[in-house]
Amino acid sequence: MQDHNSTNESFDVIVIGGGHAGCEAAITTAKLGFSTALFTINLDRIAWQPCNPAVGGPAKSQLVHEVDALGGIIGKLADETAIQKRILNASRGPAVWALRAQTDKREYSKKMIEILQNTDNLSLKEAMITELDIAKTEQIGLNSKKILKKRIKGVKTFFGSYYSARSVIITAGTFLEGRIWIGNKSMSAGRSGEQAAQGLTQNLHEIGIKTERLKTGTPARVDKRSIIFDELDVQPSTAVDKYFSFDPDIKNNMPQVSCHITRTTTKTHQLIRDNLHLTPIYGGFIDSKGPRYCPSIEDKIVKFANKESHQIFLEPEGINTPEIYVQGFSTGLPENIQLELLRTLPGLGECKMLRPAYAVEYDYIPATQLQTSLETKEIEYLFSAGQINGTTGYEEAAAQGLVAGVNATRKLNKKDPIIFSRESSYIGTMINDLITKDLKEPYRVLTSRSEYRLTLRGDNADRRLTPLGYQIGLINEKRWSAYQEKMNLLEEEKFRLNNTRLKNTDEISKKIELETGSKIKGSTTLKELLKRPNFHYSDLIKYNLNERNLGSSIQEGVEIDIKYEGYLKRQKNNIEQINRQSCKSLPQEINYEKIETLSLEARENLNKIKPKNFGDASKIPGVSKADLTALLVWLKIREIKKEKANIFVEKKLSS
C-alpha cells in the first residue's frame, strides 16, 4: 500500500459501488454531515436497473416504504419515475398487500445521478477499487491476552491512486470477479457491457474476509415494434394514486403504460428440454446457486415438469425506448436458441431480440461475517451492504445501504449502532436472516419470512420508523411536521368513530341495513360498523358519515387499525413477551466449543456467528430449545462463579 504522503484525497466515508445500496449509503452519510466519496466503475450507470425495471412487490414494497420512512431515496424515485403501478394481493389481507411500480430505468438513473451531484459533502469518482488499506494494532483483552485489532484506513484504485478514509462501505453488487454466461461461452463482466471488479476479492481474502460464489440471471429484451399485441392479455396501470413515499411533495408526472401477458407453450417446453445440456448450469459449466424465487425458465421446466404452461410478463423498460423486458423468461441458453424460444410464445412469433438473456456468476461475502450493524466482524469501520451480502433485488440492497450508512456515521461518532429487530421492520427481519443463517442461495425478502407481518405493513411504515429517521437526522423538519399532522388526523378520526353512534331508528341506519344487509340492533358506533367485514371506509363516505375529506392513506390506516384491532393487540403482546426473553445479551468472548452441554452443531454454529443475544441465537440453524436452555444455565453458573470470585477478592483486599 502506498505511503500516506501520496494520498490523493481524504474522506470520512468511502462507498465502493454505485448501485442501489451504494447510492443510499452515500446519500445517508453525506446528509448526516460526513465527507463522502462514492466510487463506481461507470458513472453513467449509477442506480441502474440491470434486471427488471421495477420496484416493489410482495415484502419488497414494505422494504421500500420502510427505507422511505427512515429518510431514504428509493421510494421517492420509484414514485417519480413509475410508468405503471399495481397493487398485488389486493384480494387478500393487508399483511400481504404490495405496491409494485414499473419504472423508466433511464429516468430513474438520471434522477439518482442528479440527487448525488447536488448532495452536499458528496463526491463522485469513476475508478475501480482493488485494495483496502488496513491498520493493525495489538490490544490487551480478557485474561491479559493480546488481541490483534484491524481497522480500515483507506482504499487503492486499479491505477494506483490512494484515498484515505475513516470508514469504508463495500456495495459492489454482482461485480466482484463477475462473469456472464450465454450457453458455454463466458466473459468477465459485472453485467452485460460493463467490466467486472478485479483484484478486490483476493485482497478481501488477504485481510481475513471469506467470499463464496453465487449466480443470478436476466432475460432477453425484445423490440416492442415486433410484438403482436392483439394476441396478448393487457395488464393496465391501476394504482397510479398509490405511493411508496410518505413525503406529500412527491408526485408522478410520467405517462402510464400497460404491460402484457403471454404464456409458454408445449413447443417452448420441448425446445428447452432438447437443449438443457447447452445451459451453463445443466451443462456443468458452473455450479453456483441461483435465486430460488426467481428461477430461470429451464429451472421452471425441470422442477415443474407437470405444469403445462408458465405465465410470462412483457414489461416496458421506459417511455422513450422500444425495449421490452420478458419477465419470467431468464435463461442461459445460447443466443440462437433464445430467439427460437421467444418465438414460441404467443404474440412473439416474429419478435426481434435486442439483447440476449444471460447468467452472471459473482463473488459475495457470506453475511455471517457481519455484525447486526452490517460492520464486518473482522475489520473495524468496514461495512458491507447489498447484493455482495448474498441478497437479490434493488429493494433489499437499498435497505442495507441505508443501514450501513447510518451505522458507519454512528461508529465515527462513537455512538451505539442502530439495530433493527425482526419485530420492528422487514429491514430487521432481512438483516437477522442474513447474519444468522448460512445461506447458500441469493436471499429474497418474503412476507412469509416475518412472524409479525400484520404489524409490519407498508401503510404503517412511517408510524413505525419515521420517529427513528427524525432522531437519526434523515427526516427534515418539513417532513416531520407532515408526519405529526398525519398522526393527529389518524388519532382524531379513530376517536370520532369510537364516539359517534347510530340508532337503528335513524334514517341512515335503515338505508345501511337495506343496502348492506347488516342489521343495527339498538345502536352502534361507527367504529363497530367499520369492524364489519362487508363495511369499509368508502361506505362511511358514501353515507355521508365522514366528517372531513381525509387522504386515502389516513382512511386506509384507520380502517386497518379498527378492523384488525384484536389481531394487532395480540401480536403486540407476543412481541413484548418475546422481547423480554430474547434481549438477554450474550458476551462476544464466549467460546461455545468449551460448553459441553451444547450439541456439537450448536457449538460450531454459535462460535461461527457469535450472536449478540438469545433472540439471535434462537434463529441459528442447529440451535435447539434444549441448547438455549443449556446455554442459559451455563451463563447463570458463570455469573455465580464471577460473583464468588469478586467476593473472595474483596475479602482478601480488606484483610
UniProtKB/Swiss-Prot annotation:
Encoding gene (name): mnmG
Cited SMART domains: GIDA_assoc_3
Function: NAD-binding protein involved in the addition of a carboxymethylaminomethyl (cmnm) group at the wobble position (U34) of certain tRNAs, forming tRNA-cmnm(5)s(2)U34.
Chief site of localization: cytoplasm
This protein's name: tRNA uridine 5-carboxymethylaminomethyl modification enzyme MnmG
Compartment(s): Cytoplasm
Key word Oxidoreductase present: no
Family of this protein: Belongs to the MnmG family.
Binding site for FAD: G17, G18, G19, H20, A21, G22
Cofactor(s) recorded in Swiss-Prot or TrEMBL: FAD
Quaternary context: Homodimer. Heterotetramer of two MnmE and two MnmG subunits.
Keywords: Cytoplasm, FAD, Flavoprotein, NAD, tRNA processing
Organism of derivation: Prochlorococcus marinus (strain AS9601)
Binding site for NAD(+): 290-304
GO terms under biological process: tRNA methylation; tRNA wobble uridine modification
Lineage: Bacteria, Bacillati, Cyanobacteriota, Cyanophyceae, Synechococcales
Name of a matching Pfam family: SAM_GIDA_C
GO MF annotation, one: flavin adenine dinucleotide binding
